[in-house]
């Protein structure tokens, strides 16, 4: 028993255990590095870089993430309406996403939606594809947008401050904000409207519609060229 209580023996015993434990852990880690699975069931999966930076999130509706900016996640309760995916840059900032959902309400009304978008660097979406249905109304569209050249973090901070203002002061506050921060401008819209018409709208850099190509729900074709005041310059018969 004296041998077991000898300090030298205890030191050697401790060292041996440490080595054995380290070998076991390393071998286990090596074995886990490359694994093959048939089916994985999860509520949310984060794909990360070796340094922990999240690059892709696949999530259900309940656990859908907020907005990511510079490796920090900000709450977005409004995003808990669909399952989907979020794409993040090497810097941990949101770069786009894909969400979807469909359900039938107790009264039989159908709600169906899907959205795929890609973002400008440190900004909001510049290209998006949407499709959906609300009751009997169906739509689908492709959109292209010019975004401002300021970091979206500035808009987030501005939004936090403006939300604290009285409701009757918020519109004026946003006008002051966008006086120094260029607002997003829709440049192209291609889609099908709920009334069954299809069309293409092309806009100038200020967001004014300049060309319209469409087929109305009654089958009538439309081709319009508009000036900067919205006046039709010519309309082929």
Please tell me what each predicted stretch does.
Residues 1-34:
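Single-pass membrane-anchoring alpha-helices
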Residues 25, 30-237:
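Parallel beta-helix/beta-solenoid repeats that form elongated, surface-exposed shafts/blades used
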């Amino acid at each position: 028993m004296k041998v077991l209580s000898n300090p030298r023996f205890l030191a050697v015993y401790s060292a041996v255990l440490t080595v054995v434990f380290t070998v076991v852990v390393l071998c286990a880690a090596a074995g886990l590095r490359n694994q093959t699975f048939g089916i994985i069931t999860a509520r949310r999966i984060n794909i990360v870089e070796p340094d922990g930076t999240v690059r892709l999130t696949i999530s259900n509706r309940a656990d859908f993430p907020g907005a990511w900016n510079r490796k920090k996640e900000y709450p977005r309760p409004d995003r808990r309406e669909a399952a989907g995916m979020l794409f993040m840059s090497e810097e941990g900032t949101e770069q786009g996403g894909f969400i979807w959902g469909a359900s039938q309400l107790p009264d039989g009304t159908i709600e169906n939606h899907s959205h795929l978008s890609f973002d400008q660097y440190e900004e909001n979406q510049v290209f998006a594809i949407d499709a959906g249905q609300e009751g009997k109304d169906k739509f689908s569209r492709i959109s292209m947008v010019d975004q401002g050249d300021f970091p979206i973090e500035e808009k987030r901070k501005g939004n936090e401050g403006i939300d604290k203002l009285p409701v009757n002061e918020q519109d004026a506050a946003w006008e002051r904000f966008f006086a120094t921060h260029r607002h997003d401008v829709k440049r192209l819209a291609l889609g099908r409207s709920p009334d069954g018409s299809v069309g293409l709208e092309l806009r100038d850099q200020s967001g004014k519609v300049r060309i319209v190509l469409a087929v109305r729900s009654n089958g009538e074709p439309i081709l319009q060229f508009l000036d900067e005041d919205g006046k039709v310059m010519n309309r082929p018969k």
